[in-house]
Every structure is written in structure tokens, then in C-alpha cells.
Amino acid sequence: MAAVVLENGVLSRKLSDFGQETSYIEDNSNQNGAVSLIFSLKEEVGALAKVLRLFEENEINLTHIESRPSRLNKDEYEFFTYLDKRSKPVLGSIIKSLRNDIGATVHELSRDKEKNTVPWFPRTIQELDRFANQILSYGAELDADHPGFKDPVYRARRKQFADIAYNYRHGQPIPRVEYTEEERKTWGTVFRTLKALYKTHACYEHNHIFPLLEKYCGFREDNIPQLEDVSQFLQTCTGFRLRPVAGLLSSRDFLGGLAFRVFHCTQYIRHGSKPMYTPEPDICHELLGHVPLFSDRSFAQFSQEIGLASLGAPDEYIEKLATIYWFTVEFGLCKEGDSIKAYGAGLLSSFGELQYCLSDKPKLLPLELEKTACQEYTVTEFQPLYYVAESFNDAKEKVRTFAATIPRPFSVRYDPYTQRVEVLDNTQQLKILADSINSEVGILCHALQKIKS
């Protein structure tokens, strides 16, 4: 059961559009100052009567009501209501009763728009379709300083890749691409140069999985792997999957994908005139830098934790999470025995910076997310500063601790069986979670007994 509250205003869309149009619900004034309330109920006898009884007990006058089957859950109905403006003094207690007594999920989206407005976020993996094409730069268009800007053949090729991404929908196989001889040559140069460094510079997890990618996904100097093959491999390892994207997404949208273990991945390759340079993520960066680590369970969980922390977070915290992502998933270093190795994709896909980051030139600091989240960084040259994690598990716990500081009126968890994000803000949801944990603990205890016997 879910509910959305508006005070002194109406929704920016009617019930028929709820959750489908904008990232924020607007706070506009209506004529009588009524409080607008949207809630959803399981389709069962007496469900709505409980809510109406609650209104009656608190002397709340219901002036308007609409209903429709929920688009998010086929077993629920959604109700759009206007409450008389005199209900405002008891609105807080009503919300508390909806949560605790009836089991409602209540989102106070705009009681105070400046402080409490919660950005829209995807609740199902299918909803990633809504923003996957809202790229910020590049795609089929290139900036004037891009190596391929004056190359009409390259620009036409980029449009082909962009069209693939724009037409893709969740659940479809990723279209296969016949890469040109020049594209394979560019890949080969990057692949050969970087592979020579991995043994001495990359972390254990990267080096452990790389031979498996060569064996099962066609990672070779003379072959650019197909995203669909790599995505299938990832799903068998950690549940992560690839999704083609035409260019750079906003930080909020990109991190939101990680919450569902979806990595938005480019399919095009950098311009052949500069095989060791790219101003944007390309397939070399994605497959050589990111994919090996997404195949590791601990790192996959760490990445998903960053994504889950971003859901519904205020804009200033999205910026902090994006900075944490930059200094970990993109440019992170980790301890490995007495040595320090690279695990960030930006390092593992850059021949020059992979050598530089482990030299005596940059400054190395321990990973402390409160400080890391506020650290400025450069996107045009090698980083002057890198953060060193004790381990992926340690980094994961630090992300969880940091997520607890994000001011949002709920917690979230990902259900891998339904591929949905569950909002945990009422006792009913917590009971379901407790039952799930209890079941897992039971399996653990049973397995321990088997081992002891």
C-alpha cells in the first residue's frame, strides 16, 4: 500500500498520469487549499473502509475521490483524493496511522517543497526505459574537439549505434554489431597495450576474471566482444546486466540503474586516429575497465549499494554519491597484501593513467567517504589524488553508513526475484523483510548443522 501527499496544492498530473511524467510532483495552489492524497490498497474486502474509518475518526472531510487499477502492482488499486483544508493540523497523525496501523507506504512529496520533495525514482527494472535515452552529451552528436568530429564516416557510424540504444527496451536481446576492420584494429591496439599491464597493475579480482572473459565472451585482440554475450556472462556471475546507451546519462539516472544491477553501457568505439585517447566512455572503457569487476560478487554488491543509496536522494547527495563513484568505481585503488592495485575502470582502461596512479607522483589517501564525497576532481587530466580502499567489503560497509545519513523518509531494498525496489517505510514491509531474513538464517543454520555432522 502506498500513498503520496500534497498540501496547499494539486498534483502536476492527474491520477491517470501518476508516476509517468515528471521527476518531481509540483506544489501548485488550488482554489480551496485542499490537501491532495494518493494512496494504493491491496484489492481485498474492507481495505478502503479502513482508510475511510480513519478519516472519520479524525473528523476529516473527503471532498473528492478517484480510483483505478495500479500500474505498478496488478493486485492493488490507486485512489486520488481531496481532503478538506481543515485536515492539515492532523495530517501528521493521519500519515503515522496510515503507516503503522494500516501498513501504508506514505511519501510526503511536497508538504514543504524546498525541503521534503522526493525525486521520482524507478521502482521496477522496466522503468529504466523511461530515462535510458535522456543522454546529456555525445550520442550521435559530437563536440568540435572530438577526434571524430570532422570524420563523416565515423559520425554516421555513431548514429547507427545511437539508434540501437534509442530503440532498445528492457528484456530484449542487445542487437549484435558487425564491427569494421578499422574498429577492430583500434580495439586491438587498446587491448594489447592494456593487457600487458594488468598482471602487475590490476587488482586480483580483475586478473582472476579476465581469462574467463577471454574464454567465454570472445575477449581477444582481433575481436570486439558482443554486449549480449557479455551481459549473459555477467548475469550468471553476479546478476548484473548490460544495457546499451547512446551517451552520458545524468548522475541520478546512471546511479539509479546500478540499484537494479543494470550497467548502462556504450557500444561504439573511440576514433581510430587516437586509439589511446577518448573524451567519453566507449566500449573499450566499458568492457576492459568495468565488466571484469562487475563479475565479482563483492564489487557488484558494493556498486549496487551506491545505486540504492541514490534512490530518492536530494540533488546535493546525488552529487556526493557521484563523486564517491568517481573515486571508487572509476578511479579507485585498493590494498592487496603489501601492495596497492588498481580497480577503477578509468584506470584499467587507460594505459597512461594506469602506470601513473601506481607511481610516486599522485597523492594517496585512505578511503573516507565523508571526505571523498566532497573532494574536487579533474576530468581533463590525470588525477592528482586517489583514494585507497582496504577491501571491497570495507568500501561497501562505508557506503551503507554514508547512505544512512541521506535525508529521505524511507529505506529501500532490492528484490532480485521480482526485480523491484521495495520502499521500507511501514511495519508491513518490515515484517516481510524480517520473514525473508528469517528464512535465509534458517538455511544458514541448517547448512552449518550439516557441516558439523
Curated annotation (Swiss-Prot):
Q: What is the effect of changing residue 106 to A?
A: Mutant mice have mild features of phenylketonuria
PTM sites of type Phosphoserine: 16
Entry-annotated residues carrying N-acetylalanine: 2
Q: Decide whether keyword Iron is in the record.
A: yes
Keyword Secreted, does the record have it? no
Cited Gene3D superfamilies: Aromatic amino acid hydroxylase
InterPro entries for this protein: ACT-like_dom_sf, ACT_dom, ArAA_hydroxylase, ArAA_hydroxylase_Fe/CU_BS, ArAA_hydroxylase_sf, Aro-AA_hydroxylase_C_sf, Aromatic-AA_hydroxylase_C, Euk_PheOH_cat
Q: Where is the ACT domain?
A: 36-114
EC number of this enzyme: 1.14.16.1
Required co-factors: Fe(2+)
**Maturation and modification:** Phosphorylation at Ser-16 increases basal activity and facilitates activation by the substrate phenylalanine.
Activity control, as annotated, is:
N-terminal region of PAH is thought to contain allosteric binding sites for phenylalanine and to constitute an 'inhibitory' domain that regulates the activity of a catalytic domain in the C-terminal portion of the molecule.
What keywords sit in the KW lines? Answer: Acetylation, Allosteric enzyme, Disease variant, Iron, Metal-binding, Monooxygenase, Oxidoreductase, Phenylalanine catabolism, Phosphoprotein
Q: Which domain of life is it from?
A: Eukaryota
Q: Which GO terms describe its molecular function?
A: iron ion binding; phenylalanine 4-monooxygenase activity
Q: Name one GO biological process term.
A: L-phenylalanine catabolic process
Q: Where are the transmembrane segments?
A: none
- Can you tell me which residues bind Fe cation? 285, 290, 330
PANTHER family (alphabetical): AROMATIC AMINO ACID HYDROXYLASE, PHENYLALANINE-4-HYDROXYLASE
Task: Please give the family membership noted in the entry.
Answer: Belongs to the biopterin-dependent aromatic amino acid hydroxylase family.
Note the subunit structure. Answer: Homodimer and homotetramer.
Can you say what this protein is called? Phenylalanine-4-hydroxylase
